[in-house]
Amino acid sequence: MNQTALVVGASGIVGSALTHLLVEQGWPVTALSRHPGQQPDVTPLAADLQDPASLATALAGQQPTHVFITTWSRQATEALNIQVNAAMVRNLLDALRPTKSVRHVTLVTGLKHYLGPFDAYGKGQLPHTPFREDQGRLDVENFYYAQEDELFSAAERDGFTWNVHRPHTVTGVAVGNAMNMATTLAVYATVCKHLGRPFVFPGSRVQWDSLTDMTDARQLAQQQLWAATTPAAFDQAFNVTNGDVFRWKWMWSRIAEYFGLEAADYPAQLSPLETQMADDAPTWRQIAETNGLQEPDMNRLVSPWHTDADLGRPIEVVTDMSKSRRLGFTAYQASDQAFFDVFDQLRAQRLIP
């Protein structure tokens, strides 16, 4: 049976990795985003998910069988996050309804399903770790829940199957991405080396000492494709991480070693990147000009607010992947190597020296 993919948010960390895998596996792929880039063997579509008319125009004549929603829009409050991001999912699925071609829809959310939204991140009564998919929703407004509800409603209405994927912090390469820890840390390390500044962990003592995990964008892509093509996995949510665990006190030294730095001891007080990097844009521009880098605007590369939110959590964050493992998903990625692979790509693309 013919299978055609529509990847929504294909220019982001998650969407670009998925698009690459689908093309590699021989799928016809259409990539939809507001500003689609050129990717080999991919048909680009430009549309605004917040504009139903824009979607109707862009999707006219399209016949995707599998839809992968890998994007979201950050707003000033959780109320606005809910309003905007739920509408984006609803608008997309409403626009696709007349095609009658959609057999499966995938939605990527994340661990805020268990931790709560940015407005109430890691606060209140949280489920015990490791997080499992059968743990219920928190009693708090959360745009992930609103997105899921739009997906479930459309699936019941239109008869397609679905999956929800909940990664931890995702590592990958995408310039201008809203949540990009690996690139943020690469830029931070480069600035520290250039200025001779200590390479200081920006997060909480709990994160420094506790076990945790992460998600390589390639690992997430593999799980999305596996679930979308495995009937036993249909109509289910899955956690997805690399398959290993680590402590940041170890990972910080591994990252420092990659950049030829010495990892500083844990600081006497919390040292968020938004504070540490507040005045670094001119330094980065100088580094970029000296080394012939492609992006002199530091703010196009880094997302310190997101890295601070992840590394500043006052609780342990570990994820259970038994559910997908029992159904046959066995992919694995060492988390330190996932960082190194991103750093290597950034160097190859002349984004860091």
Language-model region placement:
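Conserved glycine-rich Rossmann-like NAD(P)H-binding loop of the short-chain dehydrogenase/reductase
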Residues: 27-36
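NAD(P)H-binding glycine-rich loop region in Rossmannoid oxidoreductase-like domains
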Residues: 37-39, 43-91
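Active-site Tyr-X1-5-Lys
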Residues: 134-168, 173
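A conserved pocket-lining segment of Rossmann-fold NAD(P)-dependent short-chain dehydrogenase/reductase
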Residues: 187-215
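Conserved Rossmann-fold NAD(P)-dependent oxidoreductase catalytic core, especially the SDR/UDP-sugar
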Residues: 87-143
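Mid/C-terminal beta-alpha module of Rossmann-like enzyme folds, strongest
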Residues: 220-308, 320-322, 326, 343, ...
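Glycine/proline-rich active-site loop of Rossmann-fold NAD(P)-dependent oxidoreductases
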Residues: 158, 172-188, 218, 227-238, ...
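N-terminal Rossmann NAD(P)H-binding glycine-rich loop of SDR-like oxidoreductase domains
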Residues: 3-27
